[in-house]
């Protein structure tokens, strides 16, 4: 387990230092460089056969990781996406604009990559580590997830979706996604298909 503290300015570092038994490696950025940078740092330093990202805000339930493990073991999956729209027990209501944007991006992705996902931007994606070379990632912003997913789908052949529970935040609670993030994601989906 790798933990990346991306320049937290609360007591995250103190909590992490007091709980060193919960992870194998800790990497800390002195300043906040964004999720994409944290993901890249994690990928640069990970080992093992599989990778999954767990955001510390707990929008995604870590107990759902057991579902990912079962699918990897039973079907030798190359990658697994958690779907907030096929939820197991609960999902918090989404902003209607975010949901419409996600449906559109998912629809375009499915056409271009010949997949049948329901929720490409849940960002709860587990995959075989050999599908992604961190040195080939060019994006650090929100579109990085689309870059990772498109590269993985082009490199692998067996992808699954599992229902996940979701307790998303709204803007007042710290949600950072905005309408303008839609455009770089769409461009990455389009250009990523033909690179």
Predicted regions and their residues:
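Active-site phosphate/pyrophosphate- and oxyanion-stabilizing loops and adjacent acidic/basic residues
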Residues: 14-17, 40, 66, 150
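Short beta-strand-to-loop acidic/aromatic patch adjacent to the donor-nucleotide binding site
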Residues: 49-57
